[in-house]
């Protein structure tokens, strides 16, 4: 209910065409026009409908289209007036499903975040609840914001590791039924996460390069921390993919061993019954000059009686 109430505040302010605005400082404070200077460095939180108004308030000119539906990657581009970027963040409970899609814009003084899902709003609420130094600078806010949406990913990767270990134990115990249906989604999700972490790492490096000079030189170190964190997550995802492949190879070895056992059993059966098969083949031909043709059945029975003890001994 509390989450729903917070979302209502977010929607109401955006429906009024204002968006939300947080003034940068050690603690993020909602902007109050009556008591705060208009040009104070801020974070504007907007929806697609209020994005243009917020960009105008922040003194940014962006000529591109603002369409969250087109967001498909985490990337950033440098423009003359601002940095423009997008975030495409997998939902932890549905990695392969719909993602949180965000656009953001940065200039020398302000940050504008465009989000129709309230995800950014919830992240800011979490930052305000958990951090004592929430955003005394643009760099510190971006650092807190980006680390917050990957803060649970190491735990998530730990759950994947546990699932793969359980599958490995099953394979070692010969429980291989349903293995392929279990391992394939894990591999696909880990591949998705690895690509996502790679994109976040590249974005951190781009921010650290500070091509437009929008960031203080002493503050760009925060972006290096983001890159390092994403790099570690990407390495962990790669290790888990390799681990999953090793377990898959073990599964294939188990399947091959079972097939070999089946073939050996069938070979033994074929060897045992080969003499009987040979006898029935001979007497099924009915050649004209074949011995015992006139007394075929007694002959076949006699041969069978002679052969059976040998078969039983084998």
Predicted segments, located by residue:
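Helix-boundary and N-terminal cytosolic regulatory elements
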Residues: 4, 8-133, 199, 203-215
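Alpha-helical structural signal
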Residues: 7, 142, 146, 259, ...
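Short, well-ordered turn and helix-capping elements at secondary-structure junctions
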Residues: 27, 89-91, 171, 175, ...
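Conserved residues at beta->alpha junctions
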Residues: 45-46, 147, 187
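Membrane-associated alpha-helical segments
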Residues: 166-168, 175-283
């Amino acid at each position: 209910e509390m989450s729903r109430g917070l979302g209502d505040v977010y929607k109401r302010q955006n429906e009024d065409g204002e968006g939300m605005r947080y003034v940068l400082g050690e603690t993020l404070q909602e902007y109050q026009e009556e008591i705060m200077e208009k040009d104070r460095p801020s974070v504007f939180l907007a929806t697609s409908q209020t994005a243009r108004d917020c960009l105008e308030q922040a003194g940014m000119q962006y000529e591109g289209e603002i369409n969250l539906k087109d967001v498909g990657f985490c990337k950033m581009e440098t423009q003359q007036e601002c940095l423009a970027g997008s975030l495409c963040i997998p939902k932890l409970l549905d990695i392969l499903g719909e993602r949180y899609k965000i656009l953001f814009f940065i200039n020398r003084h302000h940050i504008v975040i465009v989000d129709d899902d309230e995800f950014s709003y919830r992240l800011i609420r979490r930052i305000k609840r958990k951090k004592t130094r929430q955003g005394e600078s643009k760099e510190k806010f971006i650092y807190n914001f980006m680390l917050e949406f990957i803060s649970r990913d190491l735990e998530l990767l730990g759950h994947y590791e546990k699932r793969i270990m359980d599958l490995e134990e099953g394979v070692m115990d010969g429980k291989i039924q349903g293995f392929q249906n279990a391992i394939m989604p894990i591999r696909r999700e880990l591949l998705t996460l690895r690509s996502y972490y790679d994109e976040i790492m590249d974005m951190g490096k781009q921010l650290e390069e500070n091509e437009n000079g929008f960031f203080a030189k002493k503050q760009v170190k925060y972006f290096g921390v983001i890159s390092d964190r994403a790099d570690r997550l990407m390495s962990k995802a790669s290790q888990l993919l390799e681990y999953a492949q090793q377990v898959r190879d073990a599964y294939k070895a188990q399947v091959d061993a079972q097939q070999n056992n089946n073939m050996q059993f069938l070979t033994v059966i074929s060897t045992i019954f080969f003499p009987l098969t040979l006898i029935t083949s001979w007497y099924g031909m009915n050649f004209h000059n074949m011995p015992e043709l006139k007394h075929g059945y007694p002959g076949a029975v006699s041969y069978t009686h002679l052969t059976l003890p040998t078969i039983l001994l084998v």
